[in-house]
């Protein structure tokens, strides 16, 4: 033990405090340096965002300029073609190459083209697809097949040498001895159109679409009677006359290829102006009856039932109309009186709100109008699309409307606030939209042959395409009632059913994994323009440019029946969400023949 007390060194605390101050000064300087770097980064980021916005604006201006220039040229070309057609044809050096069915290219939507033009321009000009007339009424040379004949025998045309070249190749069905094996099909699809001018002839084809009548199936004779020059053909025709009709072809879905005149009575149903062919290869379990015919003054572009199944709405030129399903009575006409009275303004899409109080309409003027049905006044007008609106759908809660347009966007609108809540952009025109029953997803079909599914936050969850996907533009999509599957119809003449199996709602930098195509329904002879599922998911319905409506079994892929009940393309088909007494269901069709029809279907 030391005898001297311990004392601290006097200078130690001062040295420690100095060291602490140095460290604090270093931290402060580092913080200030980081703060300056942050401010510099923020400034650089703001500058880059501003530059990016300038680039976007310039690109948008360039796109608008390009679209305006393209529209101007298309308008000038259309005007010149109309002038040439009004004068009786085009000069020989402007004669376009003949179009073959396998080479049809539908025009693009949204940048000034008119996909509906072929139908709109031919209002009332087409006759119903009747059973082909008896052979003795169509005497043809031995090497030519019977003409399809849309309205009976046409007047004999002048000799080919006296016809302008354009008419020689592009006129409709010609008289005996001067018609091609099949009439040329219009390259303009009767689906959603481009900009205005629906009532005018399309730029690239005849004013009225030449849609073929049913082609006799393979077992039937392919030519009309003629004066025999050799005993063998005469003997063959006599044998065919006494033989019973040959059986249907082996393709179980080729109902549109069958000649109803040559079918036995138990697989067909013939009425005054409509008929049904049943698939003989599968058990017959359905029957169809006409309930009401709703005559319009223009092409019927769309049909839609209310959620309670009591009303059906139609969209036509300048107005939407609502009918009572039970009586067929027209209850009201919804027409905006403030629009220009000149020209056409086709209503491309209609959709009831779930409570039935409102009807949303989309039209060529790029506006969405939400009508209060009871007061017949406009509740909301949504602006924002830059091209025609082709499709609308209400969410099941009645709060959100989805719209698809040729401007390559899907937009979501809040009906309560009147705001555009989301813009989903793609590479090509949007032809059709649908919101899933659970209100979580929105699907859209496009001219780029694919179907996209987003969640309501805007994340792309599915892209349905690939080797099993469509080979041409998709014109219609519909969710199954349980939301697990989706059906799509295309200009490739097929319907596809997709299983929506990919994970959804999870943002990812990787390309979204598409769902799986589980069925492809083949059997239509022309573009598929509209698809839907019955409320019990038992049947897929499709409407086509071939004028037919087909019922498909989603489990087997076989068609149950084909209904022919219109004189022109079936542009829209919609089932009622409600099944009536005794399991009777209803569906509506809208057509280029200026009629909508309500039908019933029931099990037998």
Curated annotation (Swiss-Prot):
It comes from Neurospora crassa (strain ATCC 24698 / 74-OR23-1A / CBS 708.71 / DSM 1257 / FGSC 987). WD repeats lie at residues 295-324, 342-372, 384-414, 425-455, 469-499, 523-553, 565-600. This is Transcriptional repressor rco-1. InterPro entries: G-protein_beta_WD-40_rep (IPR020472), Tscrpt_rep_Tup1_N (IPR013890), WD40/YVTN_repeat-like_dom_sf (IPR015943), WD40_repeat_CS (IPR019775), WD40_repeat_dom_sf (IPR036322), WD40_rpt (IPR001680). PROSITE patterns: WD_REPEATS_1 (PS00678), WD_REPEATS_2 (PS50082), WD_REPEATS_REGION (PS50294). CDD domains: WD40. GO terms for molecular function: histone binding; histone deacetylase binding; mediator complex binding; phosphatidylinositol-3,5-bisphosphate binding; transcription corepressor activity. The keyword Transcription regulation applies. Disruption phenotype: Mutant are aconidial, female sterile, have reduced growth rates and form hyphae that coil in a counterclockwise direction, opposite to that of the wild-type. Signal peptide: none annotated. Residues 210-229 have a biased composition (Polar residues). SMART domains: WD40. Represses transcription by RNA polymerase II. May be involved at several stages of conidiation and other growth and development processes. Appears to regulate genes that are expressed in asexual and sexual spore pathways. Residues 144-163 have a biased composition (Pro residues). Residues 87-110, 124-264 are annotated as: Disordered. GO terms for biological process: conidium formation; DNA damage response; hyperosmotic response; mitotic cell cycle; negative regulation of dipeptide transport; negative regulation of transcription by RNA polymerase II; positive regulation of transcription by RNA polymerase II; regulation of fatty acid biosynthetic process. Keywords: Conidiation, Repeat, Repressor, Sporulation, Transcription, Transcription regulation, WD repeat. Residues 164-177, 190-209 have a biased composition (Low complexity). GO terms for cellular component: nucleus; transcription repressor complex.
